């Protein structure tokens, strides 16, 4: 029998899986265009000129072009008033060519994010953050119109890798509104037994060691060590943390919340960082946009 030292986890290649999904979506968009003479449309609203936000928006624009989704880019100055931003959102709500609206977060401090997210029409809320969509996600027997993209991507990675969720013990590390909380609710809906580990949790490693599935979304580089992982567990690492690396041109490299080198010797399945969850988030945004358009087209 192989010793634990030469065990290597199966790498869940998010890039390859996302590529497959994007090909499926492109085919669907072609079909919609032929049948209805229209294509799905995604509006991305960006406020100010944050470099990271612009990078994300460019990635989304390129992804839309690749699958045939029409992009509507709305750039507003940093000093835009909350009222003007809401009125722009309302304008997009009433535009029949727009089937999804995404407001790039974070917003400047003088704007209340909750007010903006609440202003997006629930049937165009492709980010899945509208309070009514999250509320439906939390309730048994209700179906939200859209699921948040990163949590949806995490479950899609598990499903497409053949990882069983039903009846398994899942531990989610982190409880943010963007990932931790909604992914816990999604796992619960999929019949996992779910525990959330957060900053006030006593003895987190003991809890994580019990998990058949670990979703790491705490935003702390290499917080989760290899010996915290149950042998054979599936590990989905949502973290993207910049750590100093003088050997890189940029001076830093991206690492996850899990110590990949250690954990991959113990886990059954693991996602790399980068190239794991990130590409799936964009693929799920495209999927949500197409689903929104299909509802409008009466499909």
Swiss-Prot record:
Keywords noted in UniProt: Hydrolase, Multifunctional enzyme, NADP, One-carbon metabolism, Oxidoreductase, Photorespiration
Transmembrane segments: none
EC number(s) on file: 1.5.1.5, 3.5.4.9
Lineage top rank: taxon: Eukaryota
Single annotated GO MF: methenyltetrahydrofolate cyclohydrolase activity
Cytoplasm keyword on record: no
Pathway: One-carbon metabolism; tetrahydrofolate interconversion
Reaction(s) catalysed (UniProt annotation): (6R)-5,10-methylene-5,6,7,8-tetrahydrofolate + NADP(+) = (6R)-5,10-methenyltetrahydrofolate + NADPH; (6R)-5,10-methenyltetrahydrofolate + H2O = (6R)-10-formyltetrahydrofolate + H(+)
Xref: SUPFAM superfamilies: Aminoacid dehydrogenase-like, N-terminal domain, NAD(P)-binding Rossmann-fold domains
InterPro entries linked: Aminoacid_DH-like_N_sf, NAD(P)-bd_dom_sf, THF_DH/CycHdrlase, THF_DH/CycHdrlase_cat_dom, THF_DH/CycHdrlase_CS, THF_DH/CycHdrlase_NAD-bd_dom
CDD domains: NAD_bind_m-THF_DH_Cyclohyd
A single BP term in Gene Ontology: tetrahydrofolate interconversion
GO cellular component: chloroplast; cytoplasm; cytosol
One Pfam family from the record: THF_DHG_CYH
Quaternary state and interactors: Homodimer.
Its job: Catalyzes the oxidation of 5,10-methylenetetrahydrofolate to 5,10-methenyltetrahydrofolate and then the hydrolysis of 5,10-methenyltetrahydrofolate to 10-formyltetrahydrofolate.
Sequence similarity: Belongs to the tetrahydrofolate dehydrogenase/cyclohydrolase family.
HAMAP family the record matches: THF_DHG_CYH
Name of the protein: Bifunctional protein FolD 2
Protein source organism: Arabidopsis thaliana
Gene name tied to this protein: FOLD2
